[in-house]
From Swiss-Prot:
Protein name per Swiss-Prot or TrEMBL: 4-hydroxy-tetrahydrodipicolinate synthase
Reactions that this protein is recorded to catalyse: L-aspartate 4-semialdehyde + pyruvate = (2S,4S)-4-hydroxy-2,3,4,5-tetrahydrodipicolinate + H2O + H(+)
Sites annotated Part of a proton relay during catalysis: T48, Y111
Annotated active site: Y137, K166
Length: 296
């Protein structure tokens, strides 16, 4: 493990729903126990993979409290709490902190495409409103705009509780700049399972992973092997699971991973609109891969 606060293998946790689309807290507790047993370092509920845009603030609070109660002090809980309206993002962050989150993952403002100064002011307002560590989530493919390395580094230097970035830009030049120029206590994590091996080899601190929902032990071993320079071992793990990493995005996340978890008997296959079940052909492809890995 890195000496930085935010590091290792973090799971971007799904939100299990019952058939009536209400939150299934029984399944949620079982998922938390699954990750404790697997050695996952951080659980992140209420993020993109947790269908956060469809959750009410009351549901966000209940999910975070449930995860925190089940996790206790065995595993860090860093909750998703972001949106594109700054005042609402502040409200979500304060709500997550009150519910017991030990850190907050806050997605960059989306759709309205603010300038870099606007992005800076957005995160500055959040940092001033809460005391827990904040993870910036940069995912241009979903938000429509990139948080520049210079903006991330400025925030990291100006605010002690801006502790990390989940970098999902696939921009290796930006990742390199962040790793080389960051403050000593600032963590850089990848949001791409397919990039864990090269990212860790470059000096990254960990991953916020979708595949960790299905194979948490494997993701943990991959991160640790790559971090400690056991590259042959890391390559072997990566080779075994890289097709699963890719198939988790055969359609929009979290649809494939929730289908997989349903096949594994861990949750019901229920989504909230506008997400809908996988196409039949994609179900067949993903199921075959899960069978080849011995997961179903």
């Amino acid at each position: 493990m890195s000496t930085r606060l935010i590091s290792g293998s973090a799971v971007a946790l799904v939100t299990p729903f019952r058939q009536d689309c209400s939150v299934d807290t029984v399944a949620l507790r079982q998922l938390v126990r699954f990750h404790i047993a697997a050695g996952t370092d951080i659980i992140i509920p209420c993020g993109t993979t947790g269908e956060s845009p469809t959750l009410s603030m009351e549901e966000q609070s209940r999910i975070i409290r449930t995860v925190k109660e089940e996790a206790g002090e065995q595993i860090m809980v860093a909750a998703g709490a972001g949106t594109n309206a700054t005042d609402h993002a502040v409200e979500l962050a304060k709500n997550a902190e009150k519910a017991g989150a030990s850190a907050i993952l806050s997605v960059a403002p989306y759709y309205n495409k603010p300038s870099q100064e606007g992005i800076y002011q957005h995160y500055a307002r959040i940092a001033e409103a809460v005391s827990v560590p904040i993870i910036i989530y940069n995912v241009p493919g979903r938000t429509g705009s990139n948080v520049a390395a210079s903006t991330i580094l400025r925030l990291a230097r100006d605010f002690g509780n801006i502790a990390a970035v989940k970098e999902a830009s696939d921009n290796m030049a930006q990742i390199t700049e962040l790793l080389e120029e960051r403050p000593e206590n600032f963590s850089v994590l990848t949001g791409e399972d397919m990039l864990i091996l090269p990212f860790m080899a470059m000096g990254g601190d960990g991953v916020i992973s979708v595949a960790a929902n299905q194979v948490p032990s494997a993701v943990k071993r991959l991160v640790e092997a790559a971090r400690t320079g056991r590259l042959d071992e890391a390559r072997a793990i990566n080779t075994r699971y890289r097709r699963l990493f890719r198939l988790n995005f055969i359609e929009s996340n979290p649809v494939p991973v929730k289908y997989a978890l349903a096949l594994m008997g861990m949750i019901e296959e229920v989504y909230r609109l506008p997400l809908v079940p996988l196409a039949d052909e994609n179900k067949r492809i993903l199921k075959e891969e899960l069978q080849s890995l011995g997961l179903v």
